[in-house]
Amino acid sequence: MTKLIEPKKYTKTLDLLRSFFLSRGFLEVHTQNRLSILAACEDPETVATYEYNGEIWPLPQTGQMWLEYELLKNPEAPGFFCVSTSYRQEPNPVEGRHEVIFPMFEFEMKGGVEELKQMEIELCEYLGIPLEQVNVKTCLLYTSDAADDA
């Protein structure tokens, strides 16, 4: 069973995420109503389906492809974000990774790895997540230079 999310915490978190990205000129995209196989870009074995209007569609796993679509269609925009519900039909879910049904906040933006890293640092600071936390410090170790050396 998927754990219930306390509404006050959910609202506060979404308000913070939305305000951060809106203040940077990002636009919100509603992806849940876009019937397409673009809603499922994960492992095909984990895609659940539903029938709608006589056709079979994947239950959404991600809005990522739609965000990329909007970014390509609107190159003048600094970026796009979405809030969606992700459905994962994982036969053996990895403990601690995510639930099989969960809310997801995603964003796509212009730029490369360095711009992304800077945006994520600013987001952590905005959310009050100390950069000294082990998980953030570990992420910062994976720079584009480190990837080139691998």
Region spans (language model):
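A conserved active-site cap/scaffold subdomain adjacent to cofactor or substrate pockets
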Residues: 98-136
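Single conserved hydrophobic/aromatic residue that forms the stacking wall/gate
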Residues: 142-150
